[in-house]
Amino acid sequence: MVEIDFNKENEEDYSDPADFVDDVTDDVLVPDVLYKKPTIDEFEGNVFIAGIPVVGAERIARLQSVLKKVLEKLEPGVKIFIPPSPEGGSLGVLLTEWPDSRSAAFAVKSLDGYSFDKNHTFSARFFTDMKKLEAPSDAWTTPVKSEYSDVGDLWWWLQNERCRDQFAISHDKLGIPTVGVFTNMKGNDPELAGDPEKAERANWTETVFTWSPHGSYLSTIHKRGIILWGGKDYARAHRFAHDNVQYIDFSPCETFLDTYLGRLEKKVPESLGFRTGELKKAYSTFELTGRTQLPTWPFFKWSIDEKYFACLKAPEKDKLEREKKIDGISIFESETFELVDKRAVTIENIKHFDWSPTAPILAYYSECTDAVPAEFGLLQVPSMQRLRSARVHNVADAQMFWQKSGKRLAFYTMRYKKKEFRETGEVKYVGGCQYHVDIFEIDKKDVSLMNLPLAEPFIHFDWDPEGDKFCVLVGNTAKATPQVYKIEANSHAPKLVSKLDAGVHFNEVQFAPKGGWLAVLAKVSAGGNVYFIDTSLAEAKRTNVIEHPLFNKGYWDPTGRYFVTCSTLGGRAGADLGYRIFTFQGRELCRKNLDRLAQFKWRPRPPVKLSEQKQNEIRKNLKKTAAKFVKQDDDEKCRASQEVVEKRRKIMAAFDVIRNRNRECLENTRHLRIALRDGVDTEAQLDEDEFVDEEITIALSTSKTAAPLSEEDERD
């Protein structure tokens, strides 16, 4: 055996130098230890609660007992900890630990805003959110209050003596994106609405523009946020900061503005105070939908009185972390931006919903499964009472259509007999499909329901806004037929009033905003036909058919007097971009071709604020008022004719001046031309006596005719 002496003084030293830096990371050396390092995910079940009573050390046990009872109503397994003050009392905050992240999320929603007693209200936040809070910057200063920006009369455009409407367009002018606001001039080219330098601007928006619902403001989108323009000079009225915003939406009464970033890393829909610019609420996209991106926009849908807004509830997950179908609607109060009754409304398999145009009533549709039929119905808010519902089996597709008056709601359903799944995952319906329109009459007792079966496939539907008629477009692309129905009192089914001539490629019907007139559109088709139909008669009558090949958009103006067809970017390739304006009867008034036309939007009008008595008075004197406008139109035509005649006279007078000046110059230089031509005056008038009349006969056509034989020829 060899003896080793560890105490040798001359043993070689293997230590690292003092300035040595190891390039091997801890992830390589000790991955098993780092795996156990606490992460922020471990605190997902922890909730921080502020607003608890501040008590002394002698009352801590009593406070802890009371808080435990309150929290155990939500989850028996909750653990609590009250951070002590230096004296042993409470600091007014509470740390809680819940079994999992779901129960913690439920606790946050339930406890945030909870009234513990008359003097204490809880404020609950995830502990992970508290960890993300940063200290205020040292350079932070108190914001300076901005001065009020007076842009003038926001409704100046409504005071036009001829009641003319305005519209805005976005197109390229000399290769530069330009937005302009125009006044529609009946029978003449549109004119810029106001100062030409202010009503039309290059690069006014970086993406798109939008009118506010009442037409008070024109909104433009920029990289740093949204700007609202108003007044006669289109001055900047408001600015809302939201970097890289892509989508915006107004509440019905112009009180709130919803914004969304879209396909960016930070995806947060926000709701802003429209007139103050104050950020009211910012929502987490993942919290709202369970996804990193919103499925549709506008995501929030507002009630007409702006008291509530709603969205589909985020889908939950089962024990295997598989996403379930959406089973409810989240309805928020605009005053507090919190859920009504602190919870969502449960509706299994809900697909979509929509608010009534006149009342806080929600219409919803939940799709069917193999075991559960489809359901469509009406929900009263905030009582959450279901006014009426109906269930139908084997529904493949459904759509809903509210009448503008809010009196009726139509549901279209396509029902199949049997379905099969192909290898590609595509669904095939076997045995044909049936098409139905179910109509809820909201103003009737217990909300009556009537059914209308359709003999042909459904294409589109629209209501007469204030009347009792509607139009259903049925058929296919080769033959589409508009059918007009009427709902009569005490009737159990709609009555077919007119079945109009079928057309090719019709795909949409639109009633005028004031009713009576109907447009049937064949958008994005080579023919580009539009039927104009008068439905105010006992039997609907087609008044005109117009053509605008490949147009992809059509709109009524807010008054229902004019209809525009547009070919814009994003339509069918090869279309001539531009717009055409027609009367409600289909007579063309204006045609404009524009380079890279992107948008055409009529300026909305605010709701009528007149009393019922005043409206009846206007209807009573409508003939006199109409005669006045007819006279103004005739005078304008005469004035236009006189202007044309006067313009022609001025042009002729200017031409005579030029002609006389040139004739005088020609006469003064005549002797020079005679000298150049060896004394021959080629410009002198010829003597008529030197002319000789000569007639020349020209045969225009010839023919061969057999001559009769003479007597001698006959004898020979």
From Swiss-Prot:
Alphabetized UniProt keyword annotations: Cytoplasm, Initiation factor, Protein biosynthesis, Repeat, RNA-binding, WD repeat
Protein family (similarity comment): Belongs to the eIF-3 subunit B family.
A UniProt-annotated Pfam family: eIF2A
SUPFAM superfamilies reported for this sequence: DPP6 N-terminal domain-like (SSF82171)
Superkingdom, natural source: Eukaryota
One GO cellular component, as annotated: eukaryotic 43S preinitiation complex
Identification of the protein by name: Eukaryotic translation initiation factor 3 subunit B
Start and end residues of each RRM domain: 45-129
Assembly mode: Component of the eukaryotic translation initiation factor 3 (eIF-3) complex.
Protein species of origin: Caenorhabditis briggsae
Protein location: Cytoplasm
WD repeat start-end pairs: 195-233, 235-283, 345-386, 411-450, 453-495, 501-543, 545-585
